[in-house]
Amino acid sequence: MTQDELKRKVAEAALDYVKDVTILGVGTGSTVNHFIDLLADLKGGIEGAVSSSQASSERLKKIGIPVLDLNAAGTLDVYVDGADEVNAAKQMIKGGGAALTREKIVAEASRKFVCIVDETKCVDVLGKFPLPVEVIPMARSLVARRLVELGGTPVWRENCITDNGNVILDVHNLTITDPVELERRINDIPGVVCNGVFALRPADVVLIGSPSGVRTLP
């Protein structure tokens, strides 16, 4: 079974969490793209979705699901999104698709966060995947210096502008033993908009696709 087939299988499993939901949150990425495509069969009961990126918004519109403003939608019942890494505590690194800030906002606005991943994303310790940090452009060099002081090796993701008009620094060589503390420390750096550690608001449910089937992280 290919990695793409695993992603589709775990996306199918997530449908069970949205069958009775009228307005849901939808994330960004290749696994979520499968989930959005599968929503086409359920869209009769879905009144709208709050999306974390322009790319997901366009995909939702193509299957006829209205995209809503979070300010109007209020609290969401369920948010479905993928992750670049996830640990046993359901804490994640996200932001490989540069949508981390909006993903974190929609996750915070949701009662239940369902994370869908294939088994390659499961890790014991976060940090092998470079940690994305969204930064206001004028602060890029300042933030990079502060990230070096934290032990990381930041690399500017050139030719990438977020939906919010900011830039991304991908921080390599971090071993994240205390995700909550690191999330707070990076957020405290002036110029940082958001970082891709999702520990203060971890997932509530993690669905993992593998060749033997889909399992739920206990």
From Swiss-Prot:
EC number: 5.3.1.6
GO function term, MF aspect, one: ribose-5-phosphate isomerase activity
Catalytic activity: aldehydo-D-ribose 5-phosphate = D-ribulose 5-phosphate
Active-site residue numbers: E103 (proton acceptor)
Record keywords, A-Z: Isomerase
GO CC terms of this entry: cytosol
Membrane-spanning ranges: none
Residues the record lists as binding substrate: T28, G29, S30, T31, D81, G82, A83, D84, K94, G95, G96, G97, K121
Subunit structure: Homodimer.
Family: Belongs to the ribose 5-phosphate isomerase family.
Function: Catalyzes the reversible conversion of ribose-5-phosphate to ribulose 5-phosphate.
Protein name according to UniProt: Ribose-5-phosphate isomerase A
Native species: Methylococcus capsulatus (strain ATCC 33009 / NCIMB 11132 / Bath)
Lineage: Bacteria, Pseudomonadati, Pseudomonadota, Gammaproteobacteria, Methylococcales
